[in-house]
């Protein structure tokens, strides 16, 4: 008898992670006795970005590992690690089966990433506080005059400016040929009414409801940024 996979998936729209859908569908803890409860909870939290203010600024355990392995954190821009992030992820698939987070964080390839992450954390925080400007519900982080953009988890801007429900990162494109506006909604205050993908599409970019980017000519950057600010403020 053919199982009704599609109906189960459709009824799991509110599942916190894709992994949880698969885990539950195939029998949960009985089918996967080696998968710990805390690891599944960590996967749910990461996939749905349900991090607290403190977990963003002071990550530990599974939360820290998530930030380390997220390419958007940017650690790879500053060091040639012994193994690539991709290879480490492949290795961790095997290692996570039989080890807890305490053991995982002691692995040499993980330790070197932890050291670099916290080395950058203070600098990244200071940089964000210096380069950010608040426009009502929006915080704009303009990094175009920064020689070095320090590594940080992608949610730090929301923890530093909790009064804002959406952000724009202004950065140079490749070789400063154009300007990039990367826009995303806060995970701490999910009240933003802007459809980010649709807004970015108006300026040749794209994305989805909660995040998106557009690239514009440098001589149009300030005009476009002003328009983005006005629309986002109007949306609330």
Region annotations inferred by a language model:
Residues 63-78, 218-227, 231:
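Long, charge-rich low-complexity segments
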Residues 71-111:
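Long, charge-rich alpha-helical interaction segments
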Residues 8-12, 30:
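A short alpha->loop->secondary-structure connector
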Residues 13-19:
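Active-site histidine-anchored catalytic micro-motif
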Residues 30-76:
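Internal, active-site/partner-interface "lid" segment
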Residues 1-9:
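Single conserved hydrophobic/aromatic residue that forms the stacking wall/gate
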Residues 98-236:
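Gly/His-enriched, cation/cofactor- and phosphate-binding structural elements
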Residues 20-28:
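Short glycine/serine- and small hydrophobic-enriched flexible loop segments
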